[in-house]
Amino acid sequence: MKRLAVLGLAAALLLTACGGSGKKSAAEQQLQVKADSYAIDAIEKTWHKAASTQNVDLMMSIWAPDATFNIGPETLSGSAQIRTFFAKTAGPFQPGHHWVSDTPAYKVRITVNGDKGTLYFECHYVDVATGKVVSVVAADQTVQRIDGKWLITSAAAATPKLAT
């Protein structure tokens, strides 16, 4: 009987130690937001690496399959249309363009709300041969964690005219 009481007490202690409300502490929540912000920021870094290396596959790795992309008055829907835009139209990906994509870090903006968030950044494309800025693009994205990975679900981009 004494053995049964000791086993019962041990089981109760074990369940108490392992139990809990299932809610994350404030510190754990804050840490999760920081981790998610870091993962969302990786989208910007991947975008610029893809643009600088003309790697359309890498660019597409940050887009959700059913994403939308607004460029001026045009709306692209889904991976196929977005891929075609980068492969055939986007300046940094065009043959003969040797551009490096740079982002002013102080202009990057990230928000996180659970499995959704936003990402804003600017791209300054510099022609390697001349060292001149040839294009500036502002990109505003909605992102979402899908199957554990943060992806762009919608984006809007605009290019202001540069003074000559």
Describe each model-derived feature in a short phrase.
Residues M1-T16:
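Sec-dependent bacterial lipoprotein signal peptides
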Residues C18-I62:
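Short, low-complexity N-terminal intrinsically disordered segments enriched in polar/charged residues
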Residues G22-K24, V136-T164:
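Short beta-strand edge/turn micro-motifs at domain boundaries
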Residues E44, W63, P73-T75, F121-Y125, ...:
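A mature extracytoplasmic/lumenal domain signature
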Residues E44-W47, A51-N55, W63-A67, F86-Q94, ...:
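Sec/Tat-exported extracytoplasmic proteins
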Residues W47, M59, A67, G78, ...:
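Hydrophobic pocket/interface hotspot
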Residues M59, T130-V134, L162-A163:
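A short acidic/glycine-rich loop-to-helix N-cap element
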Residues T68, R83-G131:
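Surface-exposed, charged secondary-structure patches
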